[in-house]
Structure formats: C-alpha cells, structure tokens
C-alpha cells in the first residue's frame, strides 16, 4: 500500500520537534519523531538563525531516520505571538445549478484572506464556522450539495505579524524542505479538546519554556487566544535563586524533585545541591523546593485569569486543559484545581512515542492539516480494500523500496476529480497500466502546481 504521511514541525523555545504521522481510522498513527534541544529560539521566535536552522535540520533528520521517510514537505506550527483572532464572512455566487466541491470551499475561504485590513499582518488560517447554501440552508459541510445561487461562509480568522511568518518559514526552508502550510497553535489546540469541552467553553493553557499560551473555545469554535511571557524558564530561575545554585542544577532538580502543589509535596524526599558562592552542599526537601515552584506556577495561572478577563471571558464551563512541557511537573493539576471550581485536566497525547505534554502542539498540527485536507478534498481516506471504491486512496506501491513523504501523492489527489472530468477517453488499445501511469503523471503535475500555487501566492503577498 502507498503510505501517506504528514510531517509537522514545532519550533519551541527549548527544543524543536518533528513528527511523522499518518491518518489511521479516527486518529493519527505516529511512525517517527525527532527532538533537538536548542538555544536558538527565544520566546517562541528565531533568536539565532544559524543555531535554530541547525536544530531544525537535526530534528528533521532524526524523524526521517526513525520513520524511514524521505522528508521533503512539512506543515509548520506557529506560536500565538503577534496574533489576531477575528470573525469574517464571504460569499461566492453561482449562475447555474452547481454541485459544491472542495474547490468552491477553498475559493470562498480564500476570499476572506483578501479582506484582511490589519496592517503588517498576514492571514494564516481561515476556519469555517458555518456554511450557508442559497441564503437559507445552513450546513457544516456543503460538499456534494447543489447550490443554485450562492455559497456563503462565516469563518474565524487568524492573522500573524508578517515578519514572524517570513522568518519562521525562511529558517525551515533553509533546511532543504518546503513548507506546505502553517497552522497557529490557536487553531491547533481545538483538536486536544473533547466536543463537550469545546461546546461548553474550555480554556487551553500551554506552559512551555518561555511562553504560556492561552486559547479559549466555546460553542465548538475558537473565541480568542493570547500568550504570556512567563513559563518554565521562570520557574527554573526562581529555583536557582531560591536554592542559591546554578541554572543547570536548578533545571535538573526541577525535573527530578519538582512539585507545584505545596500541600502534596513530600518532606521525606531529600536532595543536595552545590552552592554558587561556596563548595558546600546544602540539603533540601521536595517541600522546600515546592515553595518556590508553587508561587511561580500560581503567578502564571493568575496571569491566565487576567488574560481571560481582558478578553471578556468570565465563564469556563468546559474546564481548563493544561499541556506543554511544564505540565510534566507534579502538582500542576492539583494547584489549578485548588484555585478554580471548574474541571481541570492535564492533556498528554495518546499516541505511542509522544506521550508527553510537550508534543501536544506538534501532533495537533497534523490534526489540523488532515482536517483541512479533507474539507478541501485534497485527500479522501477510507478503509476499504476493494479497488472499485473511489475513496480508497492508500494504494500499493510494490516497486518502491523506500518510503516517500506522501505529499506528492496527496497533491495529485487534490486534482483527481478535475482531471477525471477533462481527460479524454483513452484509446481501447492502450493498456490499463499505461492509462493509470499516464493519469498519475498528469495528476501529480497538476496537483503539485495547485498546492504550491496556494502557498506561493501567500509568500508573494508577504514581500509586496
């Protein structure tokens, strides 16, 4: 069977992560990962281009080796920095009865990008909230419906500062891969929430190394998002200062003995640390350590509450979902639960090989990619083994000894319907295999042009 892969890159402040995954029934099967720690990123942005580029290149190589996939194309996640979230509508008209397909959906969504009037920003994600066919038929997915007059979309829009977008893409593509599309964490976090949480109103709190990102969802859709420049590094700084030790020692102690909820911390777990101004070793307990950690984590949560108030959000009926690298700390859930009356949970990805909160953003980027590919008819995946089914898209590739990235294939699939309509009927004397090879080549060329043109159009607009 021809494998179809998605590759995501998460450029975080402490490390760069790459995941190679494939759609599997209702979830994602992770087949390879890479992670490289780096000092080239600060507050989620490129701080040292060369160091960051090398880290990205290394993690792509690790993921490629682990998965056996020749990685050529990637989906890039972007942090919630310099980000605007707002609603917009657009409508396209039809002058005859038209069966709606992915190209019409893409057209009505792309029209929203052109309406962006926020200076020095670029629209990176447009996600449909509802579609309206012929003025009064409200639907969630209009594909295959007949429209006589119009297709309208009410959508959420995420825009980011152009300079952030340009530099992120430039750094990734300097590693020899192409960025197929970008997805903001503001949108990605929707995939880690349950339908009930998204409907009632839930707040995602991603505590990373330099940034704590906050996204609020209600009635199934993203409402707003913001970031706070206070996170795991501040916790480590407090420990280093409180224990009078080095940052590196404080980081090790945090991971080995850290506890964010003082009441649950142990006074039996004892450890010793070197002092920065002497040769002596001083002993501390987990409870001593927790005193510093709890105060800083509490401050982070208070900052989150302030953000929610500034956004005009006073109720979080769906609860709080905490993720990110610092969610690994013991006691984080208990501390937040002690501060709020709503439900609190820690989110950890369920896939084998990435069962750590710090991988939430990277795997969510793949979820976002799959969702848009299916919405726009770029891919259609089912699980029938019979070749007679049009939607069976994972096909045998017995001649290939190495795995391809899969992106060439799904770019072909994006134009399959269009090619089927316009391609002339093959002569009867032409073999079935010849026809298949000819059609595949044609689809690959046209599909690739379509996918690339979408992103090239975006990149061109950045430099205008």
Swiss-Prot record:
One GO cellular component term: cytoplasmic side of plasma membrane
**Where is it predominantly found?**
membrane
The record gives the membrane topology as:
Peripheral membrane protein
Q: Spell out the CDD domains in the cross-references.
A: ASKHA_NBD_FtsA
Among Gene3D superfamilies, the record links this protein to:
3.30.1490.110, 3.30.420.40
User: Which Pfam family, any one of them, does this sequence belong to?
Assistant: FtsA
Keyword Cell membrane belongs to the record? yes
Q: Where is the composition biased (Basic and acidic residues)?
A: 416-455
- What does the UniProt keyword field contain? Cell cycle, Cell division, Cell membrane, Membrane
Give the family this protein belongs to, as stated in its UniProt record: Belongs to the FtsA/MreB family.
Q: How does it assemble?
A: Self-interacts. Interacts with FtsZ.
The protein's role, per its UniProt record: Cell division protein that is involved in the assembly of the Z ring. May serve as a membrane anchor for the Z ring.
Question: What is the protein's name according to its record?
Answer: Cell division protein FtsA
